[in-house]
Amino acid sequence: NSGCWQEGEFVTKDQCAFFSRGRGQSPRGLRFRDKRPDYIVVDDLDDDEMCRSEARVREMTKWVKEALFGCFGGKEGRFIMVGNLIGKNSVLQKMTDSDTVYTSTVYAIGKDGTPAWPECYTIELLRSRERFMGYRSFQKEYMHNPITEGAVFQERWIRWKRMLKLRYYESLV
């Protein structure tokens, strides 16, 4: 029996096995015959509710790094994580913060003002969605730029430096 793709497990004619697991389900012990996973894809792991909880993001990041990444076989495997960056506190953000992770970001509208996927979206459609959704929501859902409501300054604008000795300042507020 080659399984059923609708149930999340199947094997192709050339003996390539596919297994699906939901967020938080244990992948430990996953194998097909004597083979362990060598290719893992995670899609849209984050959601708004999770991003509001530092503890949940921390726990899910731990699950990805331990349970998921730990189920690779002895050889190097490929790990792909796709999704929109919907929160600064998110599993996707935590993963991309690692210097060992290669990141590719595709914005719905490129710097040149053209859609990244013109076969699906026209610039008129995207601008219409932006008008309907509002700037902040559009930035979050399409441009990987989660803007915290009420935030005046973007974090990337702030430059941190070691403070000089107090005698070098004329006044401080």
What are these regions (language model features)?
Residues 14, 22-24, 83-86, 110, ...:
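Short, flexible loop/turn elements at secondary-structure junctions
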Residues 2-8, 106-107, 111-113:
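Short, surface-exposed recognition loops and adjoining beta-strand edges that mediate ligand/DNA contacts
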Residues 18-30, 155-161:
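A Trp-anchored, charged/polar loop motif used as the substrate-binding/catalytic surface
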Residues 28-34, 108-121:
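Extended acidic/charged loop-beta regions that coordinate divalent cations
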Residues 1-26:
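Conserved nucleotide-state-sensing and coupling region of NTP-binding domains
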Residues 34, 38-112:
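Signature of the SF2 helicase/ATPase Hel1-core->accessory helical subdomain module
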Residues 12, 27-38, 166:
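Short basic/glycine-enriched coil/helix segment immediately N-terminal to the Walker B
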Residues 113-173:
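ATPase catalytic-site recognition across NTP-hydrolyzing enzymes
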